[in-house]
């Protein structure tokens, strides 16, 4: 059971200002959460999920260190979700520090300038990932990539 305080805290991470202050962001949905966990590039702080999702992924979750795993009900996930219909899992991850020393030798680097729509930015990132582009640089005028 999520407390009101914790619910409000998770909801506050939907705002860029709080994401920047805390260095945390929310990931929603089974595929996104599992992709981030499997990448081992992001530290997972908390997972909120339905019982059946937790049981299905129990082996993977047992390997996580310092991650608080909380069983949640549908209505609780709906409260903390930014989506109109909540998924079976929502997780809180640490944002990565920007890497200003990008290894560009023999690699394609995608540079984005003033992409202001978070949905468009997310689409570009997913397509770049599909094509194997590892380096993406966003100008200061771009949307928050943790909101894409």
PLM regions and their residue ranges:
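N-terminal positively charged helical leader segments and presequences
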Residues: 1-84
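Structural motif
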Residues: 26, 48, 90-92, 110-111, ...
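Residue-level signal for inorganic ion chemistry
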Residues: 29, 91, 128
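Fold-independent oxyanion-binding glycine-rich loops
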Residues: 30, 51, 72-74, 93-95, ...
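Flexible, glycine-rich phosphate/dinucleotide-binding loops
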Residues: 56, 78, 98, 144-145
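Acidic/glycine-rich phosphate/pyrophosphate-binding loops and surrounding catalytic core
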Residues: 84-106, 135-138
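RNA substrate-binding interface of SAM-dependent RNA methyltransferases
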Residues: 102-148
């Amino acid at each position: 059971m999520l407390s009101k305080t914790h619910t409000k805290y998770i909801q506050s991470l939907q705002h860029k200002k709080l994401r920047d202050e805390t260095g945390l962001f929310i990931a929603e949905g089974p595929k996104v959460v599992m992709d981030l966990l499997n990448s081992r590039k992001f530290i997972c702080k908390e997972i909120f999920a339905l019982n059946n999702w937790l049981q299905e992924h129990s082996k993977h979750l047992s390997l996580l260190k310092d991650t608080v795993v909380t069983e949640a009900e549908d209505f609780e996930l709906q409260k903390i979700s930014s989506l109109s219909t909540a998924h079976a899992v929502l997780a809180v991850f640490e944002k990565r520090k920007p890497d200003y020393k990008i290894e560009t030798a023999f690699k394609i680097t995608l540079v984005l300038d003033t992409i202001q729509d978070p949905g468009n930015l997310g689409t570009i990132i997913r397509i770049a990932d599909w094509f194997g582009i590892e380096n993406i640089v966003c100008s200061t005028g771009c949307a928050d990539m943790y909101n894409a």
